[in-house]
Amino acid sequence: MNVLIIGKGGREHTLAWKAAQSSLVENVFAAPGNDGMAASAQLVNIEESDHAGLVSFAKQNQVGLTIVGPEVPLIEGLVDEFEKAGLHVFGPSKAAAIIEGSKQFAKDLMKKYDIPTAEYETFTSFDEAKAYVQEKGAPIVIKADGLAAGKGVTVAMTEEEAIACLHDFLEDEKFGDASASVVIEEYLSGEEFSLMAFVKGEKVYPMVIAQDHKRAFDGDKGPNTGGMGAYSPVPQISEETVRHAVETIVKPAAKAMVQEGRSFTGVLYAGLMLTENGSKVIEFNARFGDPETQVVLPRMESDLVQVLLDLLDDKEVDLRWKDTAAVSVVLASEGYPESYAKGTPIGSLAAETEQVVVFHAGTKAEGGEFVTNGGRVANVTAFDETFEAARDRVYKAVDEIFKPGLFFRKDIGARALKAAQK
């Protein structure tokens, strides 16, 4: 069978790498992919926004399964177009992807169906939003309602910071229509974790959890990013906590979507905070997390393609996991997530052993080596029997391949290390 992966980042490289290991698969195509994933997939020069081009390619190349990586094509209805053409595709419809496409929709859904989340209000008026912030005080969280590539959330530690953010979003329209409406919610403190599940309708098959690192710099400082690293398992989150989150959050959310006439097929990603009052939802995403996928899929023992086909065909899904640890560190371009240069030479990025894989995100091949072509450049991922060993291994590999013009966080997994030492 031929498989098509849509997207071009580190998550898509991981999906292609995992799909290529399947005994069911003859060819893996990636559209548009990136130069660094050429060992796992044949690159197809079609942008993820070219829906007609993608459908036509899938038909002409006997693609038996398409996996959509990024959120934008999902929210723009790419899955609906594949289904209309009679093609097997894994991902939510446009109607279901709204759970990520609109923060307000997701919050209202949780309120209606009693799914635990932070208290919130939604605003389109700067003056009303400002008055609310002054009434509530800081710390407080402000989110653009629509998509902003993981950069539409501000955790404001002071009222001044909150009001400046509201000004950016509502007055200066920093993200255009995406920030014309904002959700302001209470600040939650605790231990964060990402719980992804394969979902079809009310059927929910949870994956192992991961922890992501959103802030740009060590010690959780600096602006929010798409994610600077991740690890799995998360020793400070108990199995009981995860089970409880599946029963009280993920399953009810899947059921709620069915009841709303927006039945969800795909990966439902719950970004959760374990607070003193149990797990609460920070956000829902309608796809595989990035960089969480880079540590979760390497721990999957099952054949990913078989899992997705069985799920789509309403068969029993055989989901098994390895009892190993994975740690991934993002190499990013200096200046990310603000402005950064492209075209910086970064060598071969070769650190591949059986226990280290480099998943490429923003890279381009030029003259036999790679140059930077994005904010997040690559995910260096290591696996080992224990978390500590995987973490040591990943940082050794990062030191080997690091080049000027890049930066990375040196404290990925520090919280888990602390928990393991207790």
Curated annotation (Swiss-Prot):
It catalyses: 5-phospho-beta-D-ribosylamine + glycine + ATP = N(1)-(5-phospho-beta-D-ribosyl)glycinamide + ADP + phosphate + H(+). Mg(2+) binds at E283, N285. GO terms for molecular function: ATP binding; metal ion binding; phosphoribosylamine-glycine ligase activity. Residues 107-313 form the ATP-grasp domain. Pfam families: GARS_A, GARS_C, GARS_N. Its cofactor is Mg(2+); Mn(2+). SUPFAM superfamilies: Glutathione synthetase ATP-binding domain-like (SSF56059), PreATP-grasp domain (SSF52440), Rudiment single hybrid motif (SSF51246). GO terms for biological process: 'de novo' IMP biosynthetic process; purine nucleobase biosynthetic process. Pathway: Purine metabolism; IMP biosynthesis via de novo pathway; N(1)-(5-phospho-D-ribosyl)glycinamide from 5-phospho-alpha-D-ribose 1-diphosphate: step 2/2. The keyword Nucleotide-binding applies. ATP binds at residues 133-194. Binds 1 Mg(2+) or Mn(2+) ion per subunit. Keywords: ATP-binding, Ligase, Magnesium, Manganese, Metal-binding, Nucleotide-binding, Purine biosynthesis. Its EC number is 6.3.4.13. PANTHER family: PHOSPHORIBOSYLAMINE--GLYCINE LIGASE (PTHR43472), PHOSPHORIBOSYLAMINE--GLYCINE LIGASE, CHLOROPLASTIC (PTHR43472:SF1). HAMAP family: GARS. Belongs to the GARS family. This is Phosphoribosylamine--glycine ligase. It comes from Bacillus subtilis (strain 168).
